[in-house]
């Protein structure tokens, strides 16, 4: 649901001036509130039209994602591309493809993530060995292995497409410029991880306005906590 939210809320960045969009998110709270509201209005609409069932979402959290889809009980599922190789191995006779999210009037959007960080502590006891490990993990051949296992796309130049052909439609979307990072580095705060309170409210039947205010408050609380830590350190 967070990916659906981002695809709809960030539509102006995907099809317009992304730099101006993120600058406004960082500096104009009224613009931020309108952006959040656009995303939550979309989720509330999907909920009210029963495009997703709240009880089923609870079951998905507690069980294997995709079980209803692969069993033929649902015509489609919404999930990360990382699940495509898993589903393909679990149901070898099941045929499917992974497509961008069709959530805007201007076209479908692929929501991207960069969430596999590797780092080495300069204060560690075995820095040379740790550096060697990271160098090995980030070699082109190992990046290819990792991406194939995750249904992901390599950041390396001239890298081949993933071995999992089911996710190839996503590349066409990205190649056409219809992709957006859910945690864009131009944002000065981590909006992606502050959406949960608003989404939980949507699932409980609350309004898009209530969900928006919940996330605004979560962002304020996070900022105050950050400033408090900086004050103690100084």
Short names for language-model regions:
Residues 1-28, 74:
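Extracytoplasmic/periplasmic solute-binding protein
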Residues 62, 79-85, 116:
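Beta->alpha turn/N-cap motifs
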Residues 88-153, 197-201:
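Extracytoplasmic/periplasmic substrate-recognition and gating elements
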Residues 92, 147-201, 229-234:
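Long, aromatic- and glycine/proline-rich binding clefts that accommodate carbohydrate-like moieties
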């Amino acid at each position: 649901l967070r990916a659906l939210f981002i695809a709809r809320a960030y539509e102006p960045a995907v099809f317009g001036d992304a730099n101006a969009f993120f600058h406004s998110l960082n500096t104009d709270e009224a613009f931020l509130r309108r952006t959040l509201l656009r995303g939550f209005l979309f989720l509330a609409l999907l909920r009210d039209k029963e495009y997703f069932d709240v009880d089923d979402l609870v079951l998905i959290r507690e069980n294997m994602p995709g079980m209803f889809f692969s069993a033929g009980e649902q015509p489609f599922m919404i999930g990360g591309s990382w699940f495509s190789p898993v589903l393909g191995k679990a149901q070898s006779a099941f045929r499917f493809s992974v497509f961008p999210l069709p959530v805007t009037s201007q076209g479908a959007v692929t929501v991207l993530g960069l969430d596999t960080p590797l780092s080495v502590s300069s204060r560690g006891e075995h820095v040379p060995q740790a550096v060697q490990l990271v160098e090995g993990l980030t070699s082109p051949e190992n990046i290819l292995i990792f991406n194939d296992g995750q249904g992901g796309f390599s950041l390396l130049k001239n890298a081949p497409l993933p071995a999992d052909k089911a996710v190839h439609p996503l590349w066409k979307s990205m190649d056409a410029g219809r992709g957006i990072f859910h945690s864009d580095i131009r944002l000065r705060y981590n909006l992606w991880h502050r959406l949960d309170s608003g989404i939980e409210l949507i699932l409980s039947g609350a309004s898009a306005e209530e969900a928006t205010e919940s996330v605004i408050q979560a962002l304020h609380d996070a900022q105050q906590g950050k400033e408090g830590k900086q004050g103690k350190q100084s």
